[in-house]
Amino acid sequence: MRGGELSKGEEVVVEPMIIGVIPQFPPLSKQNIYGKVRMPPVGILSVLTQLKRDFGIEVYAIDENNYGGPMDSNGLPDHRALQKRQPVKLFMGYGGMSNSISRMYAVARYYQSQGIPTIAGGSHVDALPREALNSGIDVVVHGEGEETAIEIVRAMIHEGRVVKDYKKKLEQIIGISYLNEHDNYVFTGKREPIRNLDALADPDLGIVRFMAKDWSAIPISRGRGCNFKCEFCVVNKQYGPFKASSVEKVFNNIKNYVENGYKRFFVVDDNFAQNIPETIELCKLLGDYRSKSKKRFDIMVQVRTEVAENNDLIEAMRYAGVSSLAIGYESPINEELKAMRKGVTVEKLVQRSRKLSQFFHLHGMFIFGYPSFNDSKYKSDMSLSQKAKAYYKFFKDARIDTIQVFNAVPLPGSELRMKLEAENRIPPLEEIGWDKYDGLFLCYRPENGVDAFELQNLPLAMMKKRYLGSFLKRNLNYANWMNWAYDLSIGFPINFSIYYAKRFAHNLKQKEQWKGIMRKKERLLHKRNVFYESLVDAWQDTKKRIKNLAITTYGADIVRKWMRLYEKSSYSSALKKLTQVAVENNIR
């Protein structure tokens, strides 16, 4: 089923038991790239699908960021109208994004006021369960939710009705938090991780109703957790080391979507290549399917630059239809990389990135001005303006196609936040609320000697320069019309000829090397003669140029609209307070 079909007024035959809500982003977050991409979080859909399959109840979800149903007087999804139209017995909220958590709490309070029990999971409520339980949530699910949710529903629902004293049964369920009948906080203990992901149901995107538009891309989740422990991240802490479902399960999931007409996929795993042999196996299956079925689809994955060290993996990803890599470079400053525990040097990042740029579109993700602490072992003595110059140089040297530069976000549960809290550098929520925790706002007090306004504005300036260009370019070449006119006319044969000459020289140099390697193993991408191969490569380079221009033009529109909203916001007053506190600390 294509999502959104029920938004056209179709009647639901079976009365739903549970509604899952993916809360709306705040206004400014809706204008960043994440807010523009229509793609639901996999976690809550996986839990709801599991309940539908194993518990035999009807469920549905709404994504408030892609919603075409009834609206209230404030222009928000009208849950009163939804409850009248399709009354439910339980509410389940997605609490994985700090910047939308306030909206989730507001919606939960409405359902709670109607006598409907409310459940929430996700990294934010996992880290701050007491906040959630005092904000409209009855039960917080910690960690993975598929098995836990089934036990919760069994405790809450009997013969289609909510059990009044269900809280007495909750203490037997491991992995949850709640307030008992005396309003005392109860945590039932850490639950053992799910061992067999193959036993879980594939997330059913068809349960999302009242959609405004089709998905930008289909999210695919193969694994959970991460083997790395970056200071700013919570994935390893929440899910532990990486584990994955079988190659066959993921392949069949993607294949089923392709057979139903979907062509764009995004693998949401933090590192697509955590298990390289299995990743190569999956890519071979996808490539064989593409070759035999003649169906074309496009895949974007998140990886670390280490994938550049494995030629077999690169070839397999190209064979599978992987065209774009999202890479968390984070910083072009070695001291900051060490502080983050990235386990890589700037020199390695540049070397690997240049190689990967020959085969894929590279989207680089960065954190600007990573904070240091009183006891930091690694500190950079560069000024913010010097750091900005290092970023510009890195973008060019590493041959990155598109970028996003954010401030460090002190996510609840992260080691970064704990360190900032220890030095009293997290402002109260009354000053900087959760709605600002999307990377585009400075949400902590900088270290002594660092200007808060400069730290806030330099990442924005970098994005503005990258996508909008100089003042002259913004006004004379609005929407890149000169670039489009050139690239689609006289520039097309010129660019193609340049790309062909470069590729021919490169392929000629690599020809003997490939011969030696491939005598021992079978190639996935059949190597043709150097003339034809260079033509194919030059055509791919030309398409990549056009793609980058399209993304840059779209990105410029996002940045332009965001800057307008930002200039009208009251955030500058919060920045002044951060600056005042920094000055007071310097005086002391």
What are these model-derived regions, one by one?
Residues 130-134, 312-314, 372-396:
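Catalytic cores of alpha/beta
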Residues 16, 113-117, 295-297, 360:
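A short helix->loop->beta-strand "cap" motif at the edges of active sites that frequently abuts
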Residues 1-20, 58, 79-87, 181, ...:
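Radical SAM enzyme core and accessory elements
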Residues 2-17, 24-32, 173, 178-222:
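N-terminal [4Fe-4S]-dependent radical SAM core
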Residues 29-44:
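Glycine- and acidic-residue-enriched helix-capping/strand-helix junction motifs
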Residues 198-372, 381, 393:
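Radical SAM [4Fe-4S] cluster-binding motif and immediate context
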Residues 50-190, 413:
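Glycine-rich beta-alpha loop elements in corrinoid/cobalamin-binding modules
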Residues 27-30, 129-131, 228, 276-277, ...:
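Flexible glycine/acidic-rich beta-alpha junction loops that bind and position SAM and/or redox cofactors
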